[in-house]
Amino acid sequence: PTVVKNYYNSQNTNYNGNELGFRLNVDDLDNRVLAPRAYLHFVDKEALKLDDTHKLITIGDLIKQGVIEINTGDEVGKLAYGTGNIPFVRTSDISNWLIKSDPKHLISEDIYNSLAQKQDVKPGDILMVKDGSYLIGTCAMITDFDKKIVYQSHLYKIRVNNDNKYGLTSYYLIAALSSEFVKKQIFAKTFSQDIINSLGDRIKDILIPISNEQNNISNISEMVKHSITSSIKARELSRKASIDVLS
């Protein structure tokens, strides 16, 4: 079979692998996990030669260095649903880097006030799906239009601290988190927990590609900012239209 042939060839050549298999240094094994999907990002790293163009830094190291902060949200219970006008943001409310304009569940001002200081939501924060199914890894940027929210426990809140040594911005980070290189890592590190899939604390093992060129970081940040700003305008216009139709 082709797989066996490739294996024997790999003993004598610089075989990097293909869709049928790839080689991995034993030192790169993670907690004896042998599932090939857990190491697909190594293949991408070699193919894209990311080591030459990017700093590959784990989220855990970015936290230790004070570049980013990560927290998770809270549950309010079903009895809180429909008690007010404050959005309770769940995994299904996140799409295309934004929070949907019509979240399914709204909660009271009192519940919001009891959690606002703890959750400390600010424009520029990133919400990322932590648990669920196909939505894990999906991201949204907090804006001035939706900073008054409560977000659930199945979401991470990621904050980029300004003036960090990498020049990293929240706009660049949300693009990096949405890249194929990071998506494959998220898929590889997502495991079933009881009856729900979860990324959990393994988010700290994910490698973030940060460009060595500050101009690239600035250009990508501007692209993302423009994309989000345009989407916000379209979202708010559609919301206004749906209100004005009854005026």
Regions found by a protein language model. Give the residues of each.
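Short, positively charged
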Residues: 171-191
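Sequence-specific dsDNA recognition surfaces
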Residues: 60-77, 92-123
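Short, contiguous, well-structured surface segments enriched in hydrophobic/aromatic residues
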Residues: 56-59, 85-92
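A short glycine-rich beta-alpha junction/loop motif
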Residues: 148-156, 190-215
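Short, well-ordered loop/turn elements at secondary-structure boundaries
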Residues: 82-85, 120-124, 151, 202
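Generic recognition of stable, solvent-exposed alpha-helical segments in well-folded globular domains
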Residues: 116, 122, 150-153, 168, ...
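A short beta-sheet element
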Residues: 90, 118-119, 127-176
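Non-catalytic DNA-recognition/assembly elements of restriction-modification systems
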Residues: 1-77, 212-247
